[in-house]
Amino acid sequence: MNKTNEITLSPHWEDRISNEQKLRRNDQRSVFQRDRARILHSAAFRRLQAKTQVHGPGSANDFYRTRLTHSLEVSQIGTGVVAQLKLRQPEFRALLTSTSLMESICLAHDIGHPPFGHGGEIALNYMMRDHGGFEGNGQTLRILSKLEPYTEHFGMNLARRTLLGVLKYPAFLDQVHSTERPQEVTNVRHLKSIDWHPPKGVYRDDADILNWILKPLSDVDKALFSTFRFQQDSQNTHRKTRFKSIDCSIMELADDIAYGVHDLEDAIVMGIVTRNQWQESVASKLAECGDEWFEANIETISDKLFSGLQYQRKDGIGSIVNALLTSITIKPTTFNDEAEFESELLRWNAFLSPSMSYALEVLKKFVGQFVIHNSEMQRIEYKGQQIVMEIFDALNSDPERLLPENDKREWREAKESGANAHRVIADYIAGMTDGYAQRLYNQLFVPI
Protein backbone atom coordinates (compact mmCIF):
# COMPACT_ATOMS: atom_id res chain seq x y z
CA MET A 1 0.00 0.00 0.00
CA ASN A 2 1.29 3.47 -0.84
CA LYS A 3 1.94 5.78 2.03
CA THR A 4 -0.98 8.15 2.40
CA ASN A 5 1.29 11.21 2.13
CA GLU A 6 2.20 10.07 -1.40
CA ILE A 7 -1.38 10.03 -2.70
CA THR A 8 -1.64 11.08 -6.32
CA LEU A 9 -4.76 11.03 -8.47
CA SER A 10 -5.12 10.65 -12.20
CA PRO A 11 -6.07 13.89 -14.00
CA HIS A 12 -8.73 11.85 -15.81
CA TRP A 13 -10.97 12.16 -12.72
CA GLU A 14 -11.50 15.80 -13.73
CA ASP A 15 -12.47 14.90 -17.30
CA ARG A 16 -15.94 15.57 -18.67
CA ILE A 17 -17.57 13.15 -21.10
CA SER A 18 -17.90 15.96 -23.64
CA ASN A 19 -14.98 18.34 -24.22
CA GLU A 20 -17.21 21.39 -24.23
CA GLN A 21 -16.21 24.88 -25.26
CA LYS A 22 -18.28 27.35 -23.25
CA LEU A 23 -18.13 31.12 -23.73
CA ARG A 24 -16.92 32.12 -20.26
CA ARG A 25 -14.57 35.10 -20.31
CA ASN A 26 -11.70 34.92 -17.78
CA ASP A 27 -13.29 32.00 -15.95
CA GLN A 28 -10.89 31.08 -13.12
CA ARG A 29 -13.15 28.55 -11.40
CA SER A 30 -12.03 25.00 -10.74
CA VAL A 31 -13.70 22.02 -12.41
CA PHE A 32 -15.68 21.28 -9.25
CA GLN A 33 -16.71 24.90 -8.70
CA ARG A 34 -18.26 24.81 -12.15
CA ASP A 35 -19.99 21.51 -11.31
CA ARG A 36 -21.47 23.06 -8.17
CA ALA A 37 -22.80 26.02 -10.17
CA ARG A 38 -24.37 23.76 -12.81
CA ILE A 39 -26.22 21.78 -10.16
CA LEU A 40 -27.39 24.82 -8.19
CA HIS A 41 -28.71 26.56 -11.30
CA SER A 42 -30.42 23.50 -12.78
CA ALA A 43 -34.18 23.13 -13.09
CA ALA A 44 -33.93 19.62 -11.64
CA PHE A 45 -32.39 21.03 -8.44
CA ARG A 46 -34.97 23.82 -8.15
CA ARG A 47 -37.80 21.30 -8.44
CA LEU A 48 -36.61 19.65 -5.21
CA GLN A 49 -38.24 22.54 -3.33
CA ALA A 50 -41.63 21.02 -4.21
CA LYS A 51 -40.81 17.35 -3.71
CA THR A 52 -41.56 15.28 -0.63
CA GLN A 53 -38.80 14.65 1.91
CA VAL A 54 -40.94 13.21 4.74
CA HIS A 55 -43.88 15.59 4.92
CA GLY A 56 -45.34 16.44 1.54
CA PRO A 57 -45.41 20.02 0.22
CA GLY A 58 -48.76 21.54 1.02
CA SER A 59 -48.75 20.33 4.61
CA ALA A 60 -50.48 22.58 7.10
CA ASN A 61 -47.09 23.21 8.75
CA ASP A 62 -44.47 25.10 6.76
CA PHE A 63 -41.64 24.17 9.15
CA TYR A 64 -40.89 20.76 7.64
CA ARG A 65 -38.04 20.04 5.28
CA THR A 66 -38.36 19.45 1.53
CA ARG A 67 -35.95 17.54 -0.69
CA LEU A 68 -34.28 20.88 -1.43
CA THR A 69 -33.63 21.95 2.15
CA HIS A 70 -32.59 18.38 2.99
CA SER A 71 -30.03 18.49 0.16
CA LEU A 72 -28.68 21.83 1.40
CA GLU A 73 -28.29 20.41 4.91
CA VAL A 74 -26.56 17.30 3.59
CA SER A 75 -24.15 19.61 1.76
CA GLN A 76 -23.43 21.58 4.93
CA ILE A 77 -22.80 18.41 6.94
CA GLY A 78 -20.69 16.88 4.16
CA THR A 79 -18.39 19.89 3.93
CA GLY A 80 -18.18 19.92 7.73
CA VAL A 81 -17.02 16.31 7.67
CA VAL A 82 -14.36 17.15 5.07
CA ALA A 83 -13.12 20.09 7.16
CA GLN A 84 -12.74 18.07 10.35
CA LEU A 85 -11.09 15.15 8.51
CA LYS A 86 -8.47 17.50 7.06
CA LEU A 87 -7.63 18.64 10.60
CA ARG A 88 -7.71 15.22 12.28
CA GLN A 89 -6.07 13.24 9.47
CA PRO A 90 -3.93 15.69 7.47
CA GLU A 91 -2.30 12.80 5.60
CA PHE A 92 -5.51 12.57 3.54
CA ARG A 93 -5.64 16.20 2.45
CA ALA A 94 -4.57 15.23 -1.05
CA LEU A 95 -7.78 13.18 -1.30
CA LEU A 96 -10.00 15.91 0.17
CA THR A 97 -8.80 18.94 -1.73
CA SER A 98 -12.07 20.45 -2.91
CA THR A 99 -14.97 21.65 -0.79
CA SER A 100 -16.86 22.37 -4.01
CA LEU A 101 -16.60 18.70 -4.99
CA MET A 102 -18.32 17.58 -1.78
CA GLU A 103 -20.94 20.32 -2.11
CA SER A 104 -21.66 19.19 -5.67
CA ILE A 105 -22.09 15.55 -4.70
CA CYS A 106 -24.30 16.32 -1.72
CA LEU A 107 -26.46 18.85 -3.55
CA ALA A 108 -27.03 16.39 -6.39
CA HIS A 109 -27.57 13.20 -4.39
CA ASP A 110 -31.39 13.33 -4.34
CA ILE A 111 -31.98 15.04 -7.67
CA GLY A 112 -33.47 11.92 -9.24
CA HIS A 113 -36.14 11.24 -6.66
CA PRO A 114 -39.65 11.29 -8.15
CA PRO A 115 -42.75 13.06 -6.80
CA PHE A 116 -44.29 11.72 -3.58
CA GLY A 117 -41.08 10.26 -2.21
CA HIS A 118 -40.79 6.50 -1.90
CA GLY A 119 -44.43 6.09 -2.94
CA GLY A 120 -43.60 7.59 -6.32
CA GLU A 121 -40.46 5.48 -6.59
CA ILE A 122 -42.36 2.24 -5.92
CA ALA A 123 -45.07 3.27 -8.38
CA LEU A 124 -42.60 3.93 -11.19
CA ASN A 125 -40.67 0.76 -10.43
CA TYR A 126 -43.86 -1.26 -10.76
CA MET A 127 -44.92 0.44 -13.98
CA MET A 128 -41.39 -0.08 -15.39
CA ARG A 129 -41.14 -3.70 -14.16
CA ASP A 130 -40.80 -5.06 -17.71
CA HIS A 131 -38.71 -2.17 -19.01
CA GLY A 132 -35.65 -1.93 -16.77
CA GLY A 133 -37.22 -0.81 -13.48
CA PHE A 134 -36.95 2.53 -11.71
CA GLU A 135 -34.80 3.64 -8.77
CA GLY A 136 -34.04 7.10 -7.41
CA ASN A 137 -30.25 6.84 -7.36
CA GLY A 138 -30.15 5.46 -10.88
CA GLN A 139 -32.40 8.32 -11.97
CA THR A 140 -30.05 10.82 -10.33
CA LEU A 141 -27.16 9.57 -12.45
CA ARG A 142 -29.38 9.71 -15.55
CA ILE A 143 -30.44 13.32 -14.92
CA LEU A 144 -26.88 14.47 -14.27
CA SER A 145 -25.38 12.70 -17.28
CA LYS A 146 -28.16 12.73 -19.91
CA LEU A 147 -31.41 14.54 -19.14
CA GLU A 148 -30.75 18.00 -17.66
CA PRO A 149 -30.57 20.35 -20.68
CA TYR A 150 -27.29 22.08 -19.85
CA THR A 151 -25.86 20.30 -22.90
CA GLU A 152 -27.63 18.67 -25.83
CA HIS A 153 -26.72 15.06 -25.08
CA PHE A 154 -24.72 14.84 -21.84
CA GLY A 155 -26.90 16.44 -19.17
CA MET A 156 -24.87 18.70 -16.90
CA ASN A 157 -21.65 17.16 -18.27
CA LEU A 158 -20.15 16.91 -14.79
CA ALA A 159 -16.62 15.82 -13.99
CA ARG A 160 -15.97 12.09 -13.72
CA ARG A 161 -15.09 12.27 -10.01
CA THR A 162 -18.32 14.12 -9.23
CA LEU A 163 -20.33 11.38 -10.92
CA LEU A 164 -18.30 8.71 -9.11
CA GLY A 165 -19.18 10.45 -5.85
CA VAL A 166 -22.89 10.29 -6.65
CA LEU A 167 -22.62 6.61 -7.64
CA LYS A 168 -23.79 4.88 -4.45
CA TYR A 169 -24.52 1.51 -6.07
CA PRO A 170 -22.12 0.58 -8.93
CA ALA A 171 -24.12 -2.26 -10.49
CA PHE A 172 -27.06 -2.64 -12.86
CA LEU A 173 -30.54 -3.14 -11.43
CA ASP A 174 -30.91 -6.55 -13.05
CA GLN A 175 -27.67 -7.71 -11.39
CA VAL A 176 -28.95 -6.98 -7.88
CA HIS A 177 -32.64 -7.77 -8.37
CA SER A 178 -34.17 -10.63 -6.41
CA THR A 179 -34.37 -13.88 -8.35
CA GLU A 180 -38.11 -14.15 -7.81
CA ARG A 181 -40.39 -11.30 -8.91
CA PRO A 182 -43.49 -10.51 -6.85
CA GLN A 183 -46.92 -11.31 -8.19
CA GLU A 184 -48.39 -8.62 -10.43
CA VAL A 185 -51.70 -7.08 -9.38
CA THR A 186 -54.88 -6.80 -11.44
CA ASN A 187 -55.75 -3.51 -9.73
CA VAL A 188 -52.97 -1.03 -8.89
CA ARG A 189 -54.83 -0.01 -5.75
CA HIS A 190 -54.01 -3.45 -4.38
CA LEU A 191 -50.26 -3.01 -4.90
CA LYS A 192 -48.29 -3.62 -1.70
CA SER A 193 -45.32 -1.29 -1.50
CA ILE A 194 -43.19 -3.80 0.39
CA ASP A 195 -43.32 -6.13 -2.62
CA TRP A 196 -42.05 -3.57 -5.12
CA HIS A 197 -39.24 -1.72 -3.38
CA PRO A 198 -36.64 -1.38 -6.14
CA PRO A 199 -33.11 -2.75 -5.96
CA LYS A 200 -30.39 -0.09 -5.81
CA GLY A 201 -28.32 0.49 -8.90
CA VAL A 202 -27.94 1.86 -12.42
CA TYR A 203 -30.21 1.33 -15.44
CA ARG A 204 -28.99 -0.82 -18.32
CA ASP A 205 -30.06 2.12 -20.48
CA ASP A 206 -27.15 4.05 -18.94
CA ALA A 207 -24.42 1.42 -19.32
CA ASP A 208 -22.39 3.84 -21.44
CA ILE A 209 -22.25 6.36 -18.60
CA LEU A 210 -21.27 3.79 -15.97
CA ASN A 211 -18.53 2.44 -18.22
CA TRP A 212 -17.20 5.95 -18.82
CA ILE A 213 -17.14 6.78 -15.09
CA LEU A 214 -15.17 3.63 -14.25
CA LYS A 215 -12.78 3.84 -17.23
CA PRO A 216 -9.70 5.07 -15.24
CA LEU A 217 -9.93 2.06 -12.90
CA SER A 218 -7.90 -1.08 -13.45
CA ASP A 219 -9.72 -4.29 -14.36
CA VAL A 220 -8.96 -5.59 -10.85
CA ASP A 221 -10.57 -2.52 -9.25
CA LYS A 222 -13.59 -2.67 -11.55
CA ALA A 223 -14.22 -6.29 -10.58
CA LEU A 224 -13.80 -5.65 -6.85
CA PHE A 225 -15.88 -2.45 -6.97
CA SER A 226 -18.89 -4.30 -8.38
CA THR A 227 -18.96 -7.08 -5.76
CA PHE A 228 -21.97 -7.48 -3.50
CA ARG A 229 -22.30 -6.93 0.21
CA PHE A 230 -23.94 -10.30 0.80
CA GLN A 231 -25.59 -13.09 -1.10
CA GLN A 232 -29.36 -13.14 -1.25
CA ASP A 233 -30.78 -14.89 1.81
CA SER A 234 -34.04 -15.52 -0.01
CA GLN A 235 -35.36 -15.37 -3.55
CA ASN A 236 -37.28 -12.20 -2.66
CA THR A 237 -34.27 -10.27 -1.33
CA HIS A 238 -32.37 -7.78 -3.47
CA ARG A 239 -28.60 -7.84 -3.31
CA LYS A 240 -26.57 -4.72 -2.54
CA THR A 241 -23.23 -3.53 -3.78
CA ARG A 242 -20.53 -3.36 -1.17
CA PHE A 243 -18.20 -0.52 -2.13
CA LYS A 244 -18.28 3.18 -2.95
CA SER A 245 -15.72 5.95 -3.40
CA ILE A 246 -14.39 7.97 -0.48
CA ASP A 247 -16.40 11.01 -1.62
CA CYS A 248 -19.57 8.93 -1.81
CA SER A 249 -18.94 7.48 1.67
CA ILE A 250 -18.80 11.00 3.13
CA MET A 251 -21.96 12.04 1.29
CA GLU A 252 -23.79 8.94 2.48
CA LEU A 253 -22.85 9.60 6.12
CA ALA A 254 -23.98 13.22 5.77
CA ASP A 255 -27.26 12.03 4.24
CA ASP A 256 -27.84 9.53 7.06
CA ILE A 257 -27.10 12.15 9.72
CA ALA A 258 -29.49 14.63 8.11
CA TYR A 259 -32.18 11.95 7.88
CA GLY A 260 -31.72 10.62 11.39
CA VAL A 261 -31.39 13.97 13.16
CA HIS A 262 -32.99 16.75 11.11
CA ASP A 263 -36.08 14.72 10.16
CA LEU A 264 -36.35 13.94 13.87
CA GLU A 265 -36.49 17.68 14.54
CA ASP A 266 -39.40 18.06 12.12
CA ALA A 267 -41.25 15.27 13.91
CA ILE A 268 -40.72 16.85 17.34
CA VAL A 269 -41.91 20.28 16.19
CA MET A 270 -45.01 18.84 14.53
CA GLY A 271 -45.89 16.72 17.56
CA ILE A 272 -45.54 13.41 15.72
CA VAL A 273 -43.26 11.94 18.40
CA THR A 274 -43.51 12.29 22.18
CA ARG A 275 -40.94 12.50 24.96
CA ASN A 276 -42.00 9.06 26.21
CA GLN A 277 -41.48 7.50 22.77
CA TRP A 278 -38.08 9.16 22.54
CA GLN A 279 -37.06 8.04 26.01
CA GLU A 280 -38.08 4.44 25.46
CA SER A 281 -36.85 3.98 21.89
CA VAL A 282 -33.80 6.25 21.72
CA ALA A 283 -32.51 7.90 24.91
CA SER A 284 -32.35 4.67 26.90
CA LYS A 285 -30.30 3.03 24.13
CA LEU A 286 -27.99 5.99 23.53
CA ALA A 287 -27.26 6.07 27.26
CA GLU A 288 -25.66 2.66 26.81
CA CYS A 289 -24.22 3.00 23.28
CA GLY A 290 -20.60 2.89 24.43
CA ASP A 291 -19.77 6.51 23.60
CA GLU A 292 -18.78 8.37 26.78
CA TRP A 293 -19.98 11.75 25.55
CA PHE A 294 -23.43 10.47 24.60
CA GLU A 295 -23.79 8.51 27.81
CA ALA A 296 -22.93 11.61 29.86
CA ASN A 297 -25.09 14.09 27.93
CA ILE A 298 -28.14 12.25 26.58
CA GLU A 299 -30.38 13.35 29.44
CA THR A 300 -29.49 17.02 28.91
CA ILE A 301 -29.99 16.64 25.14
CA SER A 302 -33.40 15.04 25.72
CA ASP A 303 -34.45 17.95 27.94
CA LYS A 304 -33.42 20.44 25.26
CA LEU A 305 -35.19 18.59 22.43
CA PHE A 306 -38.52 18.51 24.25
CA SER A 307 -38.25 21.81 26.16
CA GLY A 308 -40.71 23.58 23.86
CA LEU A 309 -38.15 26.35 23.35
CA GLN A 310 -36.84 26.69 19.83
CA TYR A 311 -33.31 27.76 20.77
CA GLN A 312 -32.99 24.85 23.20
CA ARG A 313 -34.22 22.37 20.62
CA LYS A 314 -31.79 23.72 18.01
CA ASP A 315 -28.94 23.40 20.49
CA GLY A 316 -29.90 19.80 21.20
CA ILE A 317 -30.07 18.96 17.49
CA GLY A 318 -26.75 20.68 16.87
CA SER A 319 -25.12 18.73 19.69
CA ILE A 320 -26.16 15.41 18.17
CA VAL A 321 -25.02 16.40 14.67
CA ASN A 322 -21.65 17.57 16.00
CA ALA A 323 -21.14 14.41 18.05
CA LEU A 324 -21.75 12.26 15.00
CA LEU A 325 -19.74 14.41 12.61
CA THR A 326 -16.64 14.54 14.82
CA SER A 327 -16.60 10.76 15.29
CA ILE A 328 -15.95 10.12 11.58
CA THR A 329 -12.51 8.94 10.46
CA ILE A 330 -10.95 7.65 7.25
CA LYS A 331 -10.02 3.97 7.22
CA PRO A 332 -9.16 1.33 4.62
CA THR A 333 -12.18 0.13 2.67
CA THR A 334 -11.21 -3.54 2.76
CA PHE A 335 -10.11 -5.71 5.66
CA ASN A 336 -6.57 -6.95 6.27
CA ASP A 337 -7.10 -10.37 4.71
CA GLU A 338 -8.82 -9.01 1.60
CA ALA A 339 -7.52 -7.68 -1.68
CA GLU A 340 -7.20 -3.91 -1.61
CA PHE A 341 -8.08 -1.36 -4.25
CA GLU A 342 -5.37 0.15 -6.41
CA SER A 343 -7.24 3.46 -6.77
CA GLU A 344 -6.86 5.81 -3.81
CA LEU A 345 -10.45 7.00 -4.34
CA LEU A 346 -11.69 3.48 -3.58
CA ARG A 347 -9.00 2.31 -1.14
CA TRP A 348 -10.23 4.64 1.59
CA ASN A 349 -13.69 5.39 2.99
CA ALA A 350 -15.10 7.50 5.81
CA PHE A 351 -16.57 5.60 8.76
CA LEU A 352 -18.34 6.44 11.99
CA SER A 353 -16.89 4.97 15.18
CA PRO A 354 -18.72 1.72 16.10
CA SER A 355 -20.54 3.29 19.06
CA MET A 356 -21.70 6.30 17.03
CA SER A 357 -22.65 4.10 14.09
CA TYR A 358 -24.94 2.25 16.49
CA ALA A 359 -26.30 5.58 17.80
CA LEU A 360 -27.11 6.76 14.28
CA GLU A 361 -28.87 3.48 13.49
CA VAL A 362 -31.00 3.95 16.62
CA LEU A 363 -31.96 7.45 15.45
CA LYS A 364 -32.75 6.31 11.89
CA LYS A 365 -34.83 3.40 13.15
CA PHE A 366 -36.79 5.78 15.39
CA VAL A 367 -37.53 8.15 12.50
CA GLY A 368 -38.53 5.20 10.34
CA GLN A 369 -40.85 3.71 12.95
CA PHE A 370 -42.58 6.80 14.27
CA VAL A 371 -42.35 9.19 11.30
CA ILE A 372 -41.97 7.39 7.97
CA HIS A 373 -44.30 4.53 8.90
CA ASN A 374 -46.76 6.76 10.73
CA SER A 375 -50.22 5.89 9.37
CA GLU A 376 -50.92 9.47 8.27
CA MET A 377 -47.64 9.62 6.36
CA GLN A 378 -48.33 6.23 4.78
CA ARG A 379 -51.77 7.34 3.59
CA ILE A 380 -50.22 10.36 1.89
CA GLU A 381 -47.55 8.14 0.33
CA TYR A 382 -50.19 5.67 -0.85
CA LYS A 383 -52.18 8.45 -2.48
CA GLY A 384 -49.09 9.71 -4.29
CA GLN A 385 -48.30 6.17 -5.38
CA GLN A 386 -51.74 5.87 -6.98
CA ILE A 387 -51.42 9.24 -8.71
CA VAL A 388 -48.10 8.28 -10.30
CA MET A 389 -49.34 4.88 -11.51
CA GLU A 390 -52.52 6.36 -12.99
CA ILE A 391 -50.54 9.06 -14.82
CA PHE A 392 -48.07 6.52 -16.19
CA ASP A 393 -50.87 4.27 -17.39
CA ALA A 394 -52.60 7.16 -19.16
CA LEU A 395 -49.46 8.50 -20.84
CA ASN A 396 -48.38 5.03 -21.91
CA SER A 397 -51.78 4.34 -23.47
CA ASP A 398 -51.33 7.15 -26.03
CA PRO A 399 -47.93 8.88 -25.75
CA GLU A 400 -48.23 10.80 -29.02
CA ARG A 401 -51.45 12.34 -27.82
CA LEU A 402 -50.64 13.09 -24.17
CA LEU A 403 -46.90 13.71 -23.84
CA PRO A 404 -45.53 17.29 -24.11
CA GLU A 405 -43.82 18.09 -27.42
CA ASN A 406 -40.21 17.61 -26.29
CA ASP A 407 -40.97 14.30 -24.58
CA LYS A 408 -43.11 13.21 -27.53
CA ARG A 409 -40.13 13.77 -29.84
CA GLU A 410 -37.85 11.77 -27.52
CA TRP A 411 -40.42 8.98 -27.35
CA ARG A 412 -40.63 8.80 -31.15
CA GLU A 413 -36.85 8.74 -31.49
CA ALA A 414 -36.62 5.93 -28.94
CA LYS A 415 -39.28 3.90 -30.75
CA GLU A 416 -37.64 4.40 -34.13
CA SER A 417 -34.17 3.47 -32.87
CA GLY A 418 -35.34 0.46 -30.88
CA ALA A 419 -34.41 2.10 -27.56
CA ASN A 420 -36.46 1.93 -24.36
CA ALA A 421 -39.38 4.29 -25.08
CA HIS A 422 -40.97 3.52 -21.71
CA ARG A 423 -37.94 5.16 -20.07
CA VAL A 424 -38.97 8.45 -21.69
CA ILE A 425 -42.33 8.31 -19.91
CA ALA A 426 -40.66 7.42 -16.61
CA ASP A 427 -38.19 10.31 -17.05
CA TYR A 428 -41.05 12.75 -17.62
CA ILE A 429 -42.99 11.65 -14.54
CA ALA A 430 -39.88 11.41 -12.34
CA GLY A 431 -39.09 15.04 -13.08
CA MET A 432 -42.48 16.27 -11.85
CA THR A 433 -42.98 18.02 -8.53
CA ASP A 434 -45.70 16.75 -6.22
CA GLY A 435 -47.93 19.67 -7.16
CA TYR A 436 -47.43 19.29 -10.90
CA ALA A 437 -48.24 15.58 -10.72
CA GLN A 438 -51.40 16.34 -8.76
CA ARG A 439 -52.49 18.96 -11.31
CA LEU A 440 -51.81 16.65 -14.25
CA TYR A 441 -53.77 13.89 -12.55
CA ASN A 442 -56.69 16.30 -12.12
CA GLN A 443 -56.49 17.32 -15.80
CA LEU A 444 -56.58 13.69 -16.88
CA PHE A 445 -59.13 12.21 -14.51
CA VAL A 446 -61.20 14.79 -12.62
CA PRO A 447 -64.44 15.67 -14.46
CA ILE A 448 -64.70 19.27 -15.63
UniProtKB/Swiss-Prot annotation:
Q: Which residues form the HD domain?
A: 67-260
Name by which UniProt lists this protein: Deoxyguanosinetriphosphate triphosphohydrolase-like protein
One Pfam match: HD
One MF annotation (Gene Ontology) recorded for this entry: dGTPase activity
**Belongs to which family?**
Belongs to the dGTPase family. Type 2 subfamily.
State whether keyword Hydrolase applies. yes
Q: Which InterPro entries does its entry note?
A: dGTPase, dGTPase-like, dNTPase_2, HD/PDEase_dom, HD_domain, PHydrolase_assoc_dom
Q: Keyword Hydrolase: yes or no?
A: yes
- What superkingdom heads the lineage? Bacteria
Q: Name one GO biological process term.
A: dGTP catabolic process
Which keywords label this protein? Hydrolase
